[in-house]
């Protein structure tokens, strides 16, 4: 079970890092509303550019914490719970703008991975 947690925390972390560093300016097909990049997506949700960067910095920080958690297990659970909370928010934003369910697939996937990481990793021996 511990391996499920570790694989999940790595998967969630790499997914978030990929979105914020490799796909930031790309139209992925999963963007909210009619957005074609991250800035437009946050505008669709009614958030400012500053809010976008704050959310991004927090998500990236949580993703890094999940990776560091491979060596410092006690930080995994709080980081995973924090990331899961952001994914619940992302699901809410997709619903707010009336997106089809498929656009929520990445957020639902990271929510699932974060939940598994919180349950099966973080301080367990």
Residue ranges and their predicted role:
Residues 1-125:
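Short amphipathic, positively biased membrane-proximal segments
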